[in-house]
A protein has these predicted regions:
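Phosphate-coordination loops involved in phosphoryl transfer and adenosine-cofactor binding
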Residues: 23, 103-106, 175, 184
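Rossmann-like adenosine-cofactor binding region
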Residues: 13-16, 136-223
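Short beta->alpha connector loops at strand-helix junctions that form conserved
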Residues: 29-30, 45-57, 134, 191
Length: 223
């Protein structure tokens, strides 16, 4: 009998709402809308709305939290101190695991929407050279260099995904794409899980094809 549905992380399609004959509006309490069968909603003249921009600052912050963890080898150095290996060292500077700074690195952003733009601004403040690839092919942003997909993969030291899940982005990061990245590349996915072929990413990490990866999203959650 509902006229309006308010939900998140629930599939909305003919199977789930086929008997909801009074439904006029579906409200998603998130930014992503890949859980909606929009063609079916259009056929039934059911409107939908999302909350664009609600998580921009949080996701941008989490992007850098993951990057710092990987870039500065924080797990290794945290364990090194907690296991009391530092107190027994003969030198005060221990650099068994090398790390580097963001300044001067090329940061490639896949999907320069609200979140991608915020990440770009912060990366620029750290001194990174920011480039981006438009997954829709229509997004042009002042202040940053737009490039093609292959160039972004080949030249970026850090690659972060902030794109929605669409037919253009599903399985975008596969074995072929990963093979074009630098061996030193750090890859971050903060878009949607199915943008990445997880088996291909695992292979790339295990073989040393890329240096590291941070995943905020997975194909199946919880994994």
């Amino acid at each position: 009998d509902a006229d309006v549905l308010v939900l998140n992380k629930v599939q909305v399609n003919e199977h789930t709402i086929g008997t909801a004959r009074n439904l006029k509006l579906v409200c998603v309490t998130a930014t992503g809308t890949n859980n909606l069968d929009k063609d079916y909603l259009d056929r039934r003249n059911i409107a939908w709305r999302n909350v664009a921009g609600y998580s921009t600052e949080s996701v941008a912050q989490h992007t850098f939290a993951m990057l710092f963890y990987l870039l500065e080898k924080l797990r290794y150095y945290d364990d090194y101190v907690k296991e009391e290996r530092y107190v027994g060292d003969t030198i005060f500077t221990h650099f068994a695991e090398r790390f580097c700074q963001i300044h001067g690195k090329t940061w490639g952003i896949i999907g320069l929407g609200n979140i991608g733009r915020r990440v770009a601004d912060i990366a620029k403040a750290f001194g990174a050279n920011v480039i981006y690839y438009s997954t829709s092919g229509s997004n042009t942003q002042d202040g940053y260099t737009r490039t093609d997909f292959d160039t972004l993969l080949a030249t970026s030291d850090i690659i972060s995904v902030h794109a929605p899940l669409t037919p253009n982005t599903e399985h975008l990061i596969d074995a072929k794409a990963l093979s074009k990245m630098k061996p030193s590349a750090i890859f971050l996915n903060l878009g949607r899980g199915p943008i990445v072929v997880e088996e291909d990413l695992a292979d790339a990490l295990e073989s040393g094809q890329i240096a590291a990866a941070g995943l905020d999203v997975l194909c199946t959650e919880p994994m």
